[in-house]
């Protein structure tokens, strides 16, 4: 199950974090992060990659063994829904690759990293926060035409 697999990722961390952020679609990864960090001060922030305010929260909660309060989902970065994107997001993904030599795609990782950049610019995270960004892989979305 996703909860067990993600718990293994958390158990291998050698440092603690104030925030862990990850993309959210089916809810399994986020639920695993929430369950694995419930005894810590870490806040879990999901970035919704599909339209689903309310729905995504219910989906994640249904995967958890109990209710936890240290998580939330940000719904402002879905760019129209699952596998949808704008020219702005496409350009962000291309520029990110050019600047960092790390390929990202507009379905999951592009939306996640765009959200991170925007939230940092807005001052969402308190100064000095340690943030772990979970890149969940998958570059199949990079084949989408502009």
Show where each model-derived region lies.
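Active-site-adjacent helical/loop segments in soluble small-molecule enzymes
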Residues: 74-127
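Catalytic phosphate/nucleotide-handling subdomain of diverse soluble enzymes
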Residues: 120-129, 140-146
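Glycine-rich phosphate/pyrophosphate-binding loop at beta-loop-alpha junctions
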Residues: 2-80, 134-146
């Amino acid at each position: 199950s996703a909860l067990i697999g993600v718990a293994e990722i958390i158990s291998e961390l050698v440092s603690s974090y104030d925030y862990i952020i990850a993309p959210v679609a089916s809810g399994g990864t986020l639920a695993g992060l929430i369950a694995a960090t419930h005894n810590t001060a870490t806040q879990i922030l999901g970035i919704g990659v599909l339209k689903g305010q309310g729905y995504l929260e219910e989906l994640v909660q249904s995967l958890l063994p109990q209710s936890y309060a240290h998580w939330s989902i940000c719904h402002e970065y879905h760019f129209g829904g699952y596998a949808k994107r704008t020219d702005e997001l496409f350009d962000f993904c291309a520029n990110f690759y050019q600047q960092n030599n790390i390929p990202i795609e507009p379905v999951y990782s592009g939306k996640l990293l765009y959200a991170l950049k925007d939230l940092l610019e807005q001052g969402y995270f308190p100064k000095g926060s340690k943030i772990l960004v979970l890149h969940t892989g998958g570059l199949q979305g990079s084949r989408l035409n502009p």
